[in-house]
Structure formats: C-alpha cells, structure tokens
C-alpha cells in the first residue's frame, strides 16, 4: 500500500491507472475507520482492480457549533485497517493541500437537503458535494462506495453525480451493525456507558416500525409517532427527528407505498446518532 499526501501525485497516479484501463474503486472517509468502513473497502476490493481510500476530515461539511475539532482521528489505526482490507493507495491530504486558498466555487445542492440531517445542518451537503467533486476529480474512480447509514447523503450524491454527468458508479452498501443492532459509527466513542446500553433501542424502534408496516399499517404519521414514543420511553436521548419519506426523492408521503426510508436522529449528551431502514412496500 502506498500513502499519498498531495493532490498532484494522487492525480498523476490515477490518470495513469485509468489510461491503462484499470478500474478504480474509491472509498472516501473522514477516518477513524471501523467495520462499516472495512465492509466498503472489501466490496471495492472485490469489484475493482485498484482500491483508493481517502482519509480527510472535511471542514466544509461541519457547522460552527459541530464537532470538527474533536472528531476522532487515528491515522495509525486507519493505515492498519486499510492494509488489512486490500487498499492500494491511501490518500491522506492536509486541509491546506485540499484547500490551499479560499474556495471561489462550491457545489450548491438544491434538492433532497431540506429534510432530515439537511434541515438540521444547513450547508452540510454543500460541503459534502464540494469535497466529493474535488475527490472524484483527483482519484478518477470508476466506482465509489458509500454506506447507507447516511442514506440522505447517498441520495444527494446520486443526484449530484447524475446532474453533473460524472462518470462514476455510486455503490450504496448496507449498514453494518454491532451485535446488539447499533449502527457502527466513528462517533459511538462519545457515548457514555449508560447511553451505550440505551443506544440499540434506536434500531429496535425501526424494527418495530417495520413489523407494523409489514402487518399492514400504511399511515406515515402513526409509524413515526410510534418510533418517537418508543425512543423517548427506552432512552434518555432527545429525538431530533423520526421521519418517513419516499426514497431516494425524499418527498413527503402520507400513505406508505413504494420505496421508502424511515430515518431517525437522536441526541445524547455528547453525540447525535442517526439510523434508518429502507423498504419497498406494495
């Protein structure tokens, strides 16, 4: 595995690889890698001749009062996970390397961002889309891999890639969970011992909702109310949202049909956790 820290070198490498006809699987991350990231890397390894991993904590996607400065970082751990999962190139640029001068251009996302995390975090998806536009142009991937834990992000990225005719296939990958159902996340380290015991109830609330839908419930408001009440009963967390939308359009639905997403965000004392399920309802 080769570690690359400059845009110029990474772009030179990937240009040569693409010119020689190689397929490139790209996994963009903010580091502090866990089994969810490893799953993305393994899928990229299975489906491509070359695997490129980026580790970059992107300041553009953090709001003024968010956790940019304390976001967990451990490059030694990340290198080990990368090597264990067959990464060929680890792209590890500094903020100064990615943004040597103030951006004169950013990508504004105008659809799919006024609900869920986009509603709570204005400007977040513009930051995500801007850094991905840069990373796609630097790594020149044929395929890019994203976890469905942030399903709204996947929907936004699919739309932005289609809108700009970017020649990359977006590959969504299922959420990876702990044995008790908690979605794996770099931010889980912020949970207190008691909160960690409560956190699996997020997924249990989604499973309960899925059972009700499969049993015939089609009223979206009834389902989201059930989820909120369950989480408020079994955790001390504050429900930021528990919403149900058509997917990937993220249009509001009153009656549940077609492909839908049920997504939640819950604030604990030092961390905000998200989770979701997607299902197709006939």
Curated annotation (Swiss-Prot):
ATP binds at residues 30-37, 147-150, 176, 184-187. Disulfide bonds: none annotated. GO terms for biological process: pantothenate biosynthetic process. Gene3D superfamilies: HUPs, Pantoate-beta-alanine ligase, C-terminal domain. Keywords: ATP-binding, Cytoplasm, Ligase, Nucleotide-binding, Pantothenate biosynthesis. Pathway: Cofactor biosynthesis; (R)-pantothenate biosynthesis; (R)-pantothenate from (R)-pantoate and beta-alanine: step 1/1. The keyword Cell cycle does not apply. It is found in: Cytoplasm. The active site is at residue 37. The reaction proceeds by a bi uni uni bi ping pong mechanism. Belongs to the pantothenate synthetase family. This is Pantothenate synthetase. It comes from Bacillus thuringiensis (strain Al Hakam). The gene is panC.
